[in-house]
Each structure stands twice: as structure tokens, then as C-alpha cells.
Amino acid sequence: MTTITDPGTEMTQPVRRVRVGLVFAVGLAAVTAIAAIHLTQGSSDVGLSDLLALLTGGGADETAAVLVASRLPRLVAGVLVGVALGFAGTILQSVARNPLAAPDTLGVDAGAYFAVVATTSLGISLPVIPSGAVAFVGGLVAAGIVLGLSSAGATGPTRLVLAGSALGMALFSASTFLLILDPEGTVGLYAWRAGNIAQTGFAGVARMAPLLVVALAACLFAGRRLDLLALGDDTATVLGLRVGRARASLIVLAVFLTACSVAIAGPLGFVGLAAPALVRLAVAHIPELNRHRMLLPLGALAGVLVVLAADVLLRAFLGGKYGVEVPTGVVTSIFGAAVLVWIASRHRDSGRTPPSPGAGAGVRSRRRFILVTTAAVGITVAAALVGMMGGDTWVLMGDLANWIEESASAGLMFVLDARLPRVLSALLAGAALAVAGTVVQGVTRNPLAEPGLLGISGGAGLGAVAVIIYLPGAGLWTVTVAAAIGALVAFAAVYALSARGGLGTDRLVLVGMGVWFGSMALITVILVMTDPWNLALALTWLSGSTYGRTLPQIVPILVALVTIFPLTIAGHRQLDIMALDEDTPRLLGEPLGRDRLLALVGAALLTAAAVSAIGVLGFVGLVAPHAARALVGGHHRRVLPVAALIGASLVSVADTVGRSVIAPGQIPAGLVTALIGAPYFLWLLWKTRAPDPG
């Protein structure tokens, strides 16, 4: 029997091979070109002509020494880290079926970093391979927690990113706490946190390379399992795949690759997110690349390209000196944040309307509201009194009374005069962030949202830090205005990008988180370039601190609260309506777009004022509104004042704890609020972890 074959079909296979080969050829050519440029850069005077002379046999010994001791190890480290994170990101996105899954968004980097810091703080000094094992355990535990809270990504990208970011913030805060407790024993780990491929010799990369090769081979061998998982759990099961076991083993492989990269260069931000995103651009035009035995090597090429290009751009723009001081991970984080914003801006919300933040809170009686408010006022007053009494030197109530009457000793007057601005700034900042968080949650209809997750806190911090660093003589109001401008610019960018194709609440949160990550990376660049690795300066603004505050410095936040809070209370009905769904405000004739914009602008201004007073604080705008709704119900007329009191108490207590635990040393209030708020946030995710229907 003769089989007639369509000539077009005969030509299809060679054409496909040519297209696939062309993609890999272009990728290899790009990596080769970037690597060649990379070798010509450095802090020494060795340039392209010296390297060419060395290749032709006429180079100097100094050139060879620089190449072998510094530049080649840095290049090899960049290649290994790029390959590892490219593979890891591709695997995690395929397993979770989520384009935003990556070592960063799953908390793997943060878990690995915390494990290494915790081990070092115990006085245990580990070489490269054991430190990689410690990082692997920490990263694996973090990934397991995030995937469990987000139902393995089945509930969509928003929950996955929220869970990973919350856990990451908590672990980084805990790591910073350990750094403060043992600054001498953990020296260098703060800088290592940002990720840097600089190496002194081949020792580190030589030890990790064999482990990476074995893990990469295992990933390629598992390519068919990844292809089957992409078909869906039911289809994969029918075809004989044990889905649970396959998914678990692949996650372990991805975490192992990430741990290896962390052991070599520290947590290099967002390479595992950006590399697969670049690959998907090629896959969209060349479907033949969709098989994982093609996707994985292509993801590795993209990862190497991202890492080396970031390092080349860093040293090209900043020169040899700052190219050494500013870590490569800062540039990859900025690029990765842009990729996150790009992906999020194209994200479509699920058809199901998110529940109102007040859903399930029930209706509370007026009597209960009065009792709760009275109790909250009492707790806030008590927190303020304890804040005045506590610190490196504890005083008694009688001493406090004497200070009020101005009859205390000179030493006591000095201590309490210095504490008053700190206590007031903590109270006011906590209240402002709580009100802002209540507004943000109502507008986005997301009980897990807060000002930081919309990029507002990051923008405000960036504006304030830029003025403080570059205009050291600037006055208080200049810093406040800069923080307000930064917050409004960040908010405007988030709002504009999220509004394309309809303002979806999921999209708003995802874009906001991208802006947050980008702004924090830019803050790191400013701090490093100005005063490299000044830990106190970095922690003051990145962790939130009341240290050194004076009474005039609380005036801006007081003005913001006195102005905006009554307006927010007056608009409680609009907030209640916006918190329901997209359609109800329109049916009632409410201008939804205008109301939403005004509410978020108010939240941005309150956040900016809080940042100018105390620095960047996280989770206050999440915990306080949620606790208030649980106590007094979902109506904003009641939620707003109670949330403000809870937020004020929370930050005041956090500040007092930070001033007392390791006195005379101090822990920034932001670290304490993160250590309190992050577990609460994760508990909320656990409560609502069930997958969306359909």
C-alpha cells in the first residue's frame, strides 16, 4: 500500500528545525557578545587592547592576573547563576501554571537568605557547599509555605505573589533583626542580600559547578513530566503521571538550583521571573519551542543574558568604582520589577468579583461599637504612656507626672523630652497608615491590600530618601513634599497602568507590587552610591524608625491627618458602596472613577506623610483595618476610627519594644511591625486558601 504524503508536511519539519536553531543561535550570539564586553570592564585599567594582546601571546602578567583572579570568575559566576535561575523560574512557572511564579515571588530567595543569616548569627561559619545546603533547606520550606497558602498557584497570580511577598518581607525583616543583634558576626551579609556576582578567584564557582551540572541534567531528564503537567492534572494522570510526586520533585529541583545560585552570589532579584518572560515572547511566535527540553535551555540562555547584561549596564553607567560597590542584584531587581509590571498590566481579572473586605464581618450593634472604641482609646493611651516610660531607661508614673509639671531632674527632663516626639510620631504614623490601608482595601475590594502593596510607600520612601541624600540641607517640609510627590507619582503610574482595559483590582495590586519592588531597588542604589553599605542609614528608611525625631517633624503628618481623616469619614458611604462591586456604584448613580481616584489620592498623601515622619513601615495598613472590621463590622464610618486607634497602638508598641529589647541598641519599629504583621497576613491567606470555583 502506497502512502501519499503532502509535500507541505515534508517541508514542515526542516523549517521548524531551522526556526528553533535560529532562536538558539541568536541567543548564543547575544550571550557571547555580552560576555566579551563583560570581560573588558572592571575597576583596573585592563581594557580591550590588553585582552587582545594577551590572546595573541603578547599580554602582560598583570593582565593575566586580573583576568584570572577577578574578571573570569565574575563572568563564570554570572553564567552559572543565570543558568540556574533561568531553569528554576521556568520550572516553577510550569509547575504552578502561573506566569508570575519565580524564586522571588515564592519566597525561595528570602528563605535561603534567612537560613544563611540565622546560621551565621549562631557563630557557625560555613564554606560554600554547606552554606548552599542551608540555603536549600530554607528556600524549600519557604516555597512549601507559599505554595500551600496559594493552593499551589491555583487561585491565580495575585494570591501567589501576595503570599510570597508577605513571607519574603517577614523573612527579610527577621534576617535584618539578626544582623542588628550580631553586626560583627554577620558583617557583609547585608550587602550580600542584594545579590552580587563579584568573586575573588574560582574557588566558590568551582565547588558549586558540579552540583549545578547534575541538577540541570536532572531537569532536562524531567522535561517530559513538565510537558505532561502542562496538559492539566487530569490529562497527566490519565497518561500515567503521578502528578503530586512529579510536582514535588520538580519544585525540589527548582529550589536546589536557586540555593546553588544564592550560595554563589546571594539572592539575585527577579532573574527567575524575567528570563522565562523573555522566552515566552519567542514561544508566542515559534510554538515548536513549547516543549520543555527546548524551553529549559532557552530559559537558561535568557537568564545568562539578563544577569550579564545587568552587570555590563551597571559598570558601563556607574564606572569601575560604583560598579564594584553597587550589587548586580539591584539592576536585575529593577528590570524584574518592570517585567512584573508588564505582565501584571496584561493580566485579566477573573470573572468572579472579589468579596468585599467587610464580607463575613457581620453587622455589629451600636453598643458594641461604643465599647470597642472606648477600649481602643484606652489601649492607645496606655500604649502612649508605656512608650513614654519605656526605653533604654525606664521611668515611673511619678517621674512622668513630675515631667508634665516640669519639676523633674534635668536628666529626666532630657530623656522624656526626647521620647515625646518619638511616641507622637509613632502614634500619628500608625493612625495614618491604618486609615490609608482601610481606604485601599475598600477601593480595591481586597482585604489583603495595603498602601505598600500599591507602590505608594515605596514611592514616598524614594522621594524622601532622594531629597535627604542629594539635598542634605533641605528642610522638613521639603522632605515631606518630596515624599508626597513620590507617593503620588507611584500611585499615578500604578493607576494608569492598571486602568488599561478596565481597572481590575487584581491588576491594581500586581502592578503596585511591581512598582514597590522597583522603588525599593532604586532606594538601595541611592544609599549604596552615596554611602556604601551604611547599615544604619539603610535601616532607618527601609525599616522605619522614630530615632532622632523632633516635634517640628511631626507637624506634616498631623496636618495630613487633621485634613484628610475628616474627609474620609465624610465619604464613608462612598467607601461602603465601592467595597461592594463594580456595578452597584454605577446603578446608584455614583461617579465610581472620581470617587476611587479621590480616595486613593487621600491614601497616598497619608502614606507620604507617614513615611516622612517615620520611614517605610509595612503591614500596619493591613492588620489594623482587618482587626477593626472583625471588631465593629464592615461599615467604614465605624471601621475608620477604630482602625486608626489600632494602627496608632500597634506602631507605638512596636516602637517601645524596639527601644527596649536590646537597649541601649534599638530595633527599627518597621521590623517589629513586620514580624507581627506578616504572620497575621499569612494567617489570612491560610483562612482563604480554597481555590476559586471554576
Whereabouts are the PLM-identified features?
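Alpha-helical transmembrane segments in inner-membrane proteins
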Residues: 2-694
